A protein has these predicted regions:
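Catalytic nucleophile loop
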Residues: 1-15
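C-terminal and late-domain segments of enzyme folds
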Residues: 16-112
Length: 112
């Protein structure tokens, strides 16, 4: 079992974006969750930083996923099983070409 919030959630993906370069570079992360990037506080990203999410999405390769998790929200799941959204807001799952948002109680797959 692992719980992470904010930076503790970001480190679960494969990479952590370098905010100083607006996502053009990144640092290796733990790769515990089968996604390229985990973006916490997704609904609270300030307007000036919105291009970061676009830059990260553009870096995704076919089959890769980026997750945005809103504030006061969590996703809980296991490998090879669906993940469930808990909390007040939504979780957002992005590929390079598609996006889908899930509310509390909804389930989604990370394609694993």
């Amino acid at each position: 079992i692992y719980a992470g919030c904010s930076a503790g959630a970001m480190i679960l993906g494969r990479e952590i974006p370098d905010f100083r370069t607006m996502g053009m570079r990144s640092f290796s992360a733990f790769g515990v969750v089968p996604v390229a990037f985990v973006m916490p506080h997704f609904d609270a990203i300030p307007l000036f930083a919105k291009p970061l999410a676009s830059a990260l999405r553009n870096r995704l390769k076919p089959g890769e996923i980026m997750i945005g998790v809103d504030e006061d929200t969590a996703i809980i799941g296991k490998f090879n099983e669906d993940w469930t959204v808990f909390g007040k807001a939504k979780a957002h799952v992005f590929t390079k070409t598609e996006s889908k948002s899930y509310s509390a109680g909804e389930k989604f797959s990370l394609g694993n």
